[in-house]
């Protein structure tokens, strides 16, 4: 049996075909979405959990070495890895919020798969993280289906996050494919996420149209200009319908990070001065919220940065504010900070102003964020997104008849307004912002695996 599988930066979802239509399966708490989050007692617990409780093989030298190190470390630290030691989605977030200092938490593992300079042991770790999530998702799906799931059509961005170009894309897709097969899928095929989203929109068309699909996911923005219509639906070879692609490593997470940096970090002393009037360095505040950047987070939570923060508290004109950043460092609160920014961004989709409160840092710590504040904070990442739209059109040398906007950030009025200004007079259509890629993957799986 086949599934369409959107292993997303922000959320994961799975769909099957029933009576000719995609049907999304429940993943968590009666929702079809599983937030892309994972927690465990330690980083090493994940590898042992896969082996001990799910008989997932360590196929090569690096994964075997990682498993041996993990088992040894957990024994030395007297950590008992049980079947419930690894949690996913909102359950993992709840555990992290309850005890951030004692819970190892990861959001959006997909963000790191294309990172440059990963050592073999780091690649092996990310493969185990992805495998654990995919295994959990396959089990959730399997519990709702009578036949064994053996085939998966998995979405991938045009360009994964990372600076290595084709090499980064090869590395990231390789991690996904190996993880999927270790998680129990026998046949694994990939399709570009914007193409998949377009396939779901295509069933609504009565005639051929040039459709510009703009898919703003959690970690990437992908644009494809596609010929779509009834005559294309059942064709296995659609090469001639793909007019132009582009993709960048900017997505919803980057919007959240930018909003947190510009609007929340000043509450924690960013932009302040020392008693002598010297500006405080900005980098610690940026690294604190750059949750999709491995080196930045490693630097922020290093012992050396802890010493720097001590010095900044000592020298700052407003030491009580910088001490709040020190609390973020001490209690590992980066994810909660960015989550608060995300909640504010979502609220501003339907209101002119929202209050962002940070009681997990300090009881009364809060600020008002307006639409203008949001627009200012997001101007740089938004410009990058619009560049990709133009690049896809330049590659295609064609103009679209319609724009199909999808992805978690698609409901933002700010993005719709920017697209309308860039391409005036072209209608903007939308569908299931969180499910269109998954539905399209299920439709394409039916074509490929039938």
Task: List the predicted regions and their residue ranges.
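Phosphate-binding glycine-rich/basic clefts of nucleotide- and phosphate-handling proteins
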Residues: 35-40, 64-65, 228-360
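Early-domain small/polar-rich strand-loop-helix modules and first-structured segments
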Residues: 1-118, 251-281, 286-289
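Phosphate/pyrophosphate-binding loops at sites that engage ATP/ADP/AMP, CoA/4′-phosphopantetheine
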Residues: 137-152, 385-402
